[in-house]
Amino acid sequence: RGILYAKYQTGSGERKKKNNAVASVPKNAATGASAKASSEETNKNNFAKNAVDGNPRTRWCAAGGGAGQWLKIEFKEAADIQNIRILWEKNNAAYRYTVEASSDGKNWKQVVDQSKNKDVKQITPHKIDAKGAKFFRITFHGSSTDVWGSLWEFEAHTGPLPELPRKVMKAA
């Protein structure tokens, strides 16, 4: 968890030194995690690690459009994940996918099934219950426009999803 602080000024312009907590931000356990994929679009630097680097301007992309491409994320430590959010590359495709969670990387529990998804959404939030999760696997099952499995960012939060910056929301 993180806490945002703000300093305030009085009407006379005097700055108060006291910090006041203004919001509690849930931890994104995926940021800085390790990531592996079934394939990567290496000629364009679209590596698996980009999906968890906290930068919405870098992305992972599979090296081909076939179903069955996957992205596996391993957190530094296990966490009780309540919400995930995927920021897909394209805003004009209905991505079909599943998400699984695991505490050991061997035994998987499906937490999201969008394998028959028909909704066109670039940003897909999901409320889940994945206690003690250390691994997540996103499996791409295709899309409505035959685009490849490709996402800007995968987020996994221990609390409510924070709002996305307006710039990101506008792009979606």
Language-model segment annotations:
Residues 26-32:
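Boundary/junction segments of secreted and surface-exposed precursor proteins
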Residues 22:
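Aromatic-Pro/Gly-enriched surface loop or interdomain linker
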Residues 35:
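Extra-cytoplasmic beta-strand recognition segments
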Residues 2-19, 39-112, 116-172:
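Aromatic, loop-rich ligand-recognition surfaces of beta-strand-rich domains
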